[in-house]
């Protein structure tokens, strides 16, 4: 069933305009009486029926509302060392598909890509659009935000003050089964850029109480590691069934 995000929580009816209205009328060629789903981006789905439409808008009647079933029971924030080229585009897209709650791009010692403030802002805006499209495509109940580019040490201090950090390191560490606490519902995960984290960064993370975690004996690319980590977390916490 076609599904669209809206910026409100409708009661009896909702009005769809802009690109979504065009998509409904022009691309999908939907008719009055057909059904679609609206999501408020806060985990609620609204099952609707088209009651009227014209070239500018589509009006729908709300039949029922239910919690979105696609949202995981755990919150995962991905802190991703900024990779080269357009690899971050893929990281954002796949992370949203895998159930990430928030994405924080960060600069680490081994980051090659170091955009200036203006370029970084444009990149974040593009990544947010990618997140939005991925959330629409895979039926998410929220729109995972992409935070402004931040510094590694600031990101680690902030996340470590809120929850136990899972620090993925190619030099080895605990398995996810050992790291995951069944009572914990929020996981900040750190993934390095090409070349991984420096020894200094690893020690800094451990000093702040982070758990050094491993994704197995193989060294994964920076764009592969977050997808593998998210999949493993979702599986371990029962969110892949």
Segments (PLM) and residue ranges:
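N-terminal positively charged helical leader segments and presequences
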Residues: 1-67
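A generic structural signal for short beta-strands and their flanking turns/coil linkers
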Residues: 12, 32-34, 44-46, 56-58, ...
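Glycine/charged-rich beta-loop-alpha catalytic/anionic-binding loops adjacent to active sites
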Residues: 14-16, 73-77, 185-188, 207-215
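Short secondary-structure boundary segments
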Residues: 40, 107, 170-172, 193, ...
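RNA substrate-binding interface of SAM-dependent RNA methyltransferases
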Residues: 63, 69-164
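Active-site/ligand-binding-proximal alpha/beta "capping" segment
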Residues: 159-196, 200-201, 211-213
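Structured adenosyl-cofactor binding patch, chiefly the S-adenosyl-L-methionine
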Residues: 199-241
């Amino acid at each position: 069933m076609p599904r669209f995000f809206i910026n409100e929580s409708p009661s009896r009816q909702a009005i769809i305009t802009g690109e979504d209205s065009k998509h409904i009328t022009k691309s999908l060629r939907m008719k009055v009486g057909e059904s679609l789903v609206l999501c408020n981006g806060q985990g609620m789905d609204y099952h609707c029926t088209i009651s009227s439409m014209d070239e500018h808008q589509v009006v729908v009647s709300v039949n029922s509302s239910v919690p979105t079933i696609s949202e995981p029971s755990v919150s995962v924030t991905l802190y991703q060392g900024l990779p080269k080229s357009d690899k971050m585009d893929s990281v954002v897209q796949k992370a949203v598909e895998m159930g990430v709650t928030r994405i924080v791009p960060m600069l680490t010692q081994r980051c090659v890509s170091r955009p200036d403030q203006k370029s970084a802002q444009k990149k974040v805006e593009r990544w947010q659009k990618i997140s939005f499209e991925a959330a629409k495509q895979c039926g998410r109940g929220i729109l995972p935000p992409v935070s402004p580019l931040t510094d590694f040490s600031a990101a680690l201090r902030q996340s470590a003050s809120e929850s136990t950090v899972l620090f993925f390191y190619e030099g080895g560490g605990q398995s996810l089964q050992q790291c995951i606490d069944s009572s914990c519902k929020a996981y900040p995960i750190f993934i390095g850029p090409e070349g991984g984290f420096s020894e200094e960064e690893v020690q800094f993370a451990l000093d702040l109480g982070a758990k050094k975690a491993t994704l197995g004996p193989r060294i994964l690319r920076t764009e592969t590691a977050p997808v593998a980590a998210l999949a493993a977390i979702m599986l371990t916490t029962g969110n892949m069934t």
